[in-house]
Amino acid sequence: MYRVLRLLPLPLSVAISLSALADEKPPNWGLCPATLPLQGFEQAPGMDKHVVQSRPQLPTNIEGDTLTGTARTPLYQGNVLMARGDQFLGADSVRMDTETDSYVAEGHVRYQDSSILVVADRAEGNQDTDVHKISNIQYQLIGRRGNGVAKSVDIHGQVGQTHEATYTTCDPSQAIWRLRAPEIDVDNVEGFGVARHAVFEVGQWPVLYLPWFKFPIDSRRQTGLLYPQLGYSGRNGFDYAQPIYLNLAPNYDATLYPRYMQKRGFMIDTEFRYLYDDGKWQTRAAFIPNDQLRDKDRGRFSFNGYHNIDNHWQARASLAWVSDTRYMEDFSSRLVGMSSLSSLQSTVGVYGTGETWTAGLMADRWQLTDYSLDESALAYNRQPRLFFNWDKPVFDFLEFGLYSEVVRFKHDDAYLVALQNDGNYLRTGEVIRYYGGTRLDVKPYLLLPFTGASWYVTPTFGWRYSSYYLDSGIAEQLNGNRTPVRSLPIISLDSGVYLDRDTSVFGRNYLNTLEPRFYYLYVPYRNQSDLPLFDTRAFTFSWGQLFRDSRYTGPDRQNDANQLTLAVTSRWLDQNTGKEDLALSVGQILYFKDSLVTLNDSEERIQQGKSVWVSDVAYNVNDRWTLNATYQWNPNFRRDDLASIRARYLIGSDGIINLAYRYRRNTLDGTTQLKQTDFSFLYPINPRWSAIGRYYYSLLDKKPLEIISGLQWDSCCLAVRTVLRRYMRDRTGNMDNSIQLEFVFKGLSSVGQDTDRVLRRAILGYYRDDLYLVPPSNTTTDPDAYDPNKIP
């Protein structure tokens, strides 16, 4: 029998509220039972947001084995089923009162919609007043595995109250943890819930008592405490932070991070975010009064934001400041040796982009953040920099372009430091004065791309004009000329051929390619000894260097050249899968004359003859084994200048082993510059236990750079990670130790230090998806990051 009426909404408060506490990143439920504790209606459809939003407009169908009673109080009995959209309600019997719009559902009451399953003994209420009461319920969230029980739920419109409720994502037969509360109030209008006298239990043991606990129940943000962060390190001792979130308005908020470090004292860290229609910005500031280890006040500040002026123009700023040169060492856990630890850059600018052009006006400043260095290690400040780039294809075979910029360079004076007998670095009192200047660099070019089905020839004709207006101090250090000028043509011819054939190796069919490439470059000599070095250095020789029109990063030097690059790449592509199993590349530059331009007196001239051989190999042995190698051989000195070998083995669905060897020679004096081994792994011992580790060792210094060891235990609803780490904390070789412990309560939150950040950096492939990220291209849409030496 069928009858159309409104269906009880049953917004189960406890389940809706506690599910909002889940992690943003989907947890791994692979160790959970294949079936959920509660099973739904076979007729129930999948999640459909459009159906959910249109529920009030949909009719309700009701059916049962028998219909008795009166017109006012019909009684449905036997396999009663009510359905509306994605909502289903089943019971042994449902009695209705059509005048008061009340109902009573009894016997095996079941409810299901797109997000939840509910089993109860009894449900009663009034659909007109929207007041309902559900007794002795068990619930199961769909998709999140959250489940629990409640003695009763009282619903008054959009406000609900649960009694004697629990929540866990564990299987009910093995509930490792659960959240229990005698009373939870939920306000769907305001978007928050309040739990009173809540207890968090692990096993049968209560581990956390919350007399009053307010939490969000939807995506709306709520002011309150976030989960604490715990850790221990040799530098700070016991480390505890308690984040406090402040939802100040719909478009701006703040987070406070009160932090206690056993060896340093108290620290306050703050973050403020502001969002509006045309942009957003974020500030972060930290302050530690009287750091007990340094005996002084310390702090930092950062600002990042942008504002969209119109469809073509955007203003951007990224500012950073720290109180002293030891701040980064003391409060950063990254390995040293990176420029980001020795200096901080602040930039502000206005940038524009169009279909054929980019332009901008910006300024930046560098701050020294390494106590063992002086200001001479800093880059020049650009205050300001104005640039304009234009590229316009005219025909299929003709393209015009222009790179141009004008920059005013400034530099802080360098106050020299020296290492003392006690191991500290102190100022010596000596000062090196730095001077700046203004540089104009213009680089127009004409490009003629000719292509065929299996070949291409691209001649390029460019011209570089650079002029300077130098401060008198820097001009005197050179040749005394304050307005030097350099002007010269740059001519190149890039060509290549694509050949392929069908072949078979060990019974597998391959498409084998042969891709020779020829790149000729001619640049006449210009004496550049009277030009300063503001932002120019030599590129590290690599495969990409074979095809650049300059071996320097900036316009202060443009090398002369009469050279030809010969290179070839061969690939083996599996014809069944399309995968590239093997790729071999080798190349070399032939110098037809000496290159007289050098960066400075310490750089040797390029002699007529041959460059080092550059080779790259990428071999995918199978779906689990990959090998990569890079090698550079110097035929002039009969020595290897660079070698890099990397092997990776994938274990199961998430395990990995990485092994790498890196070697680099200082090409100026022939000494070994770098010699390292790197071994890291995530090894699954069994489905629950896995070992993690890294041993990063310098063969040159005969000491480790980083050692990581740890264990992970995983289950359906709980994961525990413990990580022991020893790492180099500064460029002088001082080491530090840390202990990180993290408990991940799946579907709820994590407690302890965030181990993911450290492990993802140390173990490539710790997150398997990281292996398949597309590496950044050499090209960029950032108008402040263009390479003035690169012609497309």
Swiss-Prot record:
GO cellular component, one term: cell outer membrane
Annotated organism of origin: Xylella fastidiosa (strain 9a5c)
Protein name in the entry: LPS-assembly protein LptD
Name of the gene this protein is made from: lptD
Oligomeric and partner information: Component of the lipopolysaccharide transport and assembly complex. Interacts with LptE and LptA.
Primary localization class, coarse: membrane
A GO BP entry: Gram-negative-bacterium-type cell outer membrane assembly
Keyword Cytoplasm in record: no
Family in the record: Belongs to the LptD family.
Keyword line: Cell outer membrane, Membrane, Signal
Span of the signal peptide: 1-22
Function: Together with LptE, is involved in the assembly of lipopolysaccharide (LPS) at the surface of the outer membrane.
Coiled coil: none
Matches recorded under Pfam families: LptD (PF04453)
Compartments it resides in: Cell outer membrane
InterPro entries: LipoPS_assembly_LptD, LptD, LptD_C
